[in-house]
């Protein structure tokens, strides 16, 4: 499976919001001779978390359901891992024709920091349903009056209208006998 985002293809996770802004900042800060690797990531988290705020006001359409609210992030997951090992939806599989979309409402910095570990570890079911929701919508649209930063497998784009859907294109993997691309995936 692949995710189509405004005509661009993504294999694992397409995320919009705070996580995409952090990814973009990592690339920007990575050019600094004073920062590299983990240092640029930690600096990017600090800049975005402390100085830029977490959420943005978006109109999110999940198939036919429209939600207008302030969101910290919206991520469409085809794979399980991104951002240095975060696993928001452990049951996401790259070969099942299902895309899991995670919606995280805008919350205070303190609450976000307190919930991030569970989110990153794929324990979204243990988090408050008024804060996080996971759905299997076929079409997701995110609209805003301001630019939305979206990260597609590490590459960022800017748009005020982000359209995410299961791509008609497919990708074949080759690996050694017995290799399973879904090894470690949660139950279907």
Model-derived regions, located:
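Short beta-strand-to-turn element immediately C-terminal to the catalytic PLP-Schiff-base lysine
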Residues: 5, 13, 25, 76, ...
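ATP/nucleoside-binding phosphotransfer catalytic cores, i.e., glycine-rich phosphate-binding loops
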Residues: 62-68, 93-94, 103-188
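A residue-level signal for conserved active-site and pocket-lining positions in enzyme catalytic cores
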Residues: 3, 22, 74, 101, ...
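Catalytic core of DAGKc-family lipid kinases
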Residues: 1-72
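Glycine-rich, charged/polar anion/phosphate-binding loops
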Residues: 43-47, 56-63, 84-89, 125-128, ...
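Short acidic/glycine-rich loop or secondary-structure boundary segments that cap or lie
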Residues: 19-22, 68-70, 82-85, 109-113
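Glycine-rich phosphate/pyrophosphate-binding beta-alpha loops
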Residues: 15, 19, 75-89, 156
């Amino acid at each position: 499976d692949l995710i189509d985002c405004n005509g661009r293809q993504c294999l694992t996770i397409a995320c919009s919001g705070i996580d995409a802004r952090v990814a973009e900042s990592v690339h920007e800060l990575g050019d600094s001779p004073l920062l590299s690797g983990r240092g640029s990531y930690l600096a990017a988290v600090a800049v975005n978390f402390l100085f830029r705020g977490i959420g943005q006001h978006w109109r999110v359409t999940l198939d036919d359901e429209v939600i207008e609210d302030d969101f910290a992030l919206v991520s469409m997951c085809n794979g399980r891992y991104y951002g240095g090992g975060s696993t928001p939806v452990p049951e996401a599989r790259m070969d099942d024709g299902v895309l899991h979309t995670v919606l995280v409402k805008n919350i205070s910095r303190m609450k976000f920091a307190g919930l991030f570990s569970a989110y990153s570890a794929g324990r979204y079911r243990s988090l408050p349903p008024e804060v996080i929701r996971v759905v299997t919508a076929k079409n997701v649209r995110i609209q805003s009056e301001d630019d939305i930063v979206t990260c597609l497998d590490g590459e960022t784009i800017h748009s005020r209208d982000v359209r995410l859907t299961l791509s008609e294109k497919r990708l074949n993997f080759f690996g050694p006998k017995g290799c399973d691309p879904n090894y470690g995936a949660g139950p279907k």
